[in-house]
Amino acid sequence: MGDTDLPCVTGVLLAAGAGKRLGRGPKALLPYRGRTLVEDAAETMLVGGCHEVVIVLGANAQAVCARANLEPYRIVVNHDWSSGMGSSYLAGDAAAHTKNHILVALVDQPGLSVTTVGRLLVSHRPGRISSAAYSSLDSPRVLRRGHPMVIDAGLRPAVASTVSGDAGARVFLRQKPWLVDLIDCSDESTGEDVDTVEQMYRLL
């Protein structure tokens, strides 16, 4: 499949969290590769093949916009961010054109690469969800579903109807596992996100 055959995809970058456990302010502003996590992730999604990127901000949204260069992207502010990731998912989904697939990524997953994004887009099949998956040292043959993931345009309303609280698309994925294609991205990343101070210092 050539680049011109790729589906029209809106990247949705969930970046609304406050990062309270880390004590460093929003995770979006953590330093990474000489800039912020949100800048790195958004550019990776765009270069990887997304036609546009919608960044969903929440906690300290004004500070994030002031400190990060987000001009190439569309910004959506989720004022209900404290209710959980579900509200941010819905805000990003609503901002994307209804005919577009969406590629959902998390700002606190620094292992996101251009190769991973491109691999998911090329692998995507109509009417399905393509999810990055990662092996672990304990079970290298077992793939663990993670982010990012491509959600087909035709499935977006059904997925959105199941979203609440902090679950995001998790409920739908558990209800309809036969619609999910796991795409092995273990060669690019462990799929871990930044939740602890130890992980943060490894990032720095």
Swiss-Prot record:
EC number: 1.1.1.328
Record GO biological process: alkaloid metabolic process; nicotine catabolic process
Annotated GO MF terms: nucleotidyltransferase activity; oxidoreductase activity
The name this protein goes by in its record: Nicotine blue oxidoreductase
Quaternary structure and partners: Homotetramer.
Pfam families recorded: NTP_transf_3 (PF12804)
Needed co-factor(s): FMN
InterPro entries per UniProt: MobA-like_NTP_Trfase, NboR, Nucleotide-diphossugar_trans
Role noted for this protein: Catalyzes the reduction of nicotine blue to its hydroquinone form. Nicotine blue is the name given to the compound formed by the autocatalytic condensation of two molecules of 2,3,6-trihydroxypyridine, an intermediate in the nicotine degradation pathway. May play a role in preventing the intracellular formation of nicotine blue semiquinone radicals, which by redox cycling would lead to the formation of toxic reactive oxygen species. Besides nicotine blue, several other quinones are reduced by nboR.
UniProt-listed SUPFAM superfamilies: Nucleotide-diphospho-sugar transferases (SSF53448)
Pathway(s) this gene product operates in, as recorded in its UniProt entry: Alkaloid degradation; nicotine degradation
Residues spanning the membrane: none
Annotated keywords: Alkaloid metabolism, NADP, Oxidoreductase, Plasmid
Reactions mediated catalytically: 3,3'-bipyridine-2,2',5,5',6,6'-hexol + NADP(+) = (E)-2,2',5,5'-tetrahydroxy-6H,6'H-(3,3'-bipyridinylidene)-6,6'-dione + NADPH + 3 H(+); 3,3'-bipyridine-2,2',5,5',6,6'-hexol + NAD(+) = (E)-2,2',5,5'-tetrahydroxy-6H,6'H-(3,3'-bipyridinylidene)-6,6'-dione + NADH + 3 H(+)
